[in-house]
Amino acid sequence: MDFKHLTQFKDIIELDKRPVKLDERETFNVSWGIDENYQVGAAISIASILENNKQNKFTFHIIADYLDKEYIELLSQLATKYQTVIKLYHIDSEPLKALPQSNIWPVSIYYRLLSFDYFSARLDSLLYLDADIVCKDSLNELIALEFKDEYGAVVIDVDAMQSKSAERLCNEDFNGSYFNSGVMYINLREWLKQRLTEKFFDLLSDESIIKKLKYPDQDILNLMFLHHAKILPRKYNCIYTIKSEFEEKNSEYYTRFINDDTVFIHYTGITKPWHDWANYASADYFRNIYNISPWRNIPYKKAVKKHEYKEKYKHLLYQKKFLDGVFTAIKYNVMKG
């Protein structure tokens, strides 16, 4: 597959509010790949890093298929507040729509791959984060990490993913080493040297591989990185699903996953901390940053899609908001048909 045309950006917007300009290689570079639904997530992810790492110099990169004036203005205010630089890369998603995707795994999952390819010619390393990740502690240890010939540094996925992934990918070596791609610190020198973008698309073009995939980009990245990655401790990708609140019915359950050592909280699942029904202590790590950000006067997101209504009404009933819960359940059933 000719992938070079996939990284042709419609526009690149630089929001540089630093009093002293630095070359990108003199800073720690962090990127996100988003569609419109994850705009606020990426913004608060940036704000959370800055709030917890005020002595470090960063360059932030957002690859997005949708940008509007309000979002750009709010990001500009964020950059001004912290005297940092945020770069926006407006990508045309149409060429990517031929790649495997679903309602749960949209085309934007491939933006991380494109960021690795694009920045491999410009930088030595890059931290990629999913836009549902919040930082709650210092990145000093991660910034100090040095690579040899590893492709990057990753965090092993939750236990429930290990044996299933090994079976699906037909390799027992993944049982205990299958990682979650939401946090990836990439050695871009090795990415370029090993021509990993080409290898990714070679695997994606192999029918025998495609039929094994459940999480398209994550599975392929695991196939590529097996025996070639540094393993980071769990604190760099503490995975928590907010639906656990009504499933476990325990307001302290989240503390099994999020604790004093946690650096990155990864809010997986349908309900995100920016949804208006995510009224839990576990979401406060996001909401506390939100409330001191340029987004603070903008209401949290309402349910729009059917699967959001399905989960929202369960949360509302658990929160004893019975009337709202019943109306939301009715709305869900009408949408379900």
Where are these regions (language model features)?
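A glycosyltransferase accessory/donor-loop signature
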Residues: 1-34, 188-337
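Hydrophobic targeting segments
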Residues: 29-32, 49, 59-61
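Histidine-anchored nucleotide/phosphate-binding helix
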Residues: 39-53
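Short internal beta-strands
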Residues: 58-66, 154-155
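Active-site-proximal specificity loops/subdomain of glycosyltransferases
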Residues: 70-118
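GT-A fold catalytic core of metal-dependent nucleotide-sugar glycosyltransferases
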Residues: 88-94, 108-163, 178, 183-186, ...
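Short, surface-exposed amphipathic charged segments that create phosphate/polyanion-binding patches used
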Residues: 99-108, 166-171, 246-251
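A short, conserved beta-to-alpha structural element at the edge of catalytic cores
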Residues: 152-173, 279-282, 295
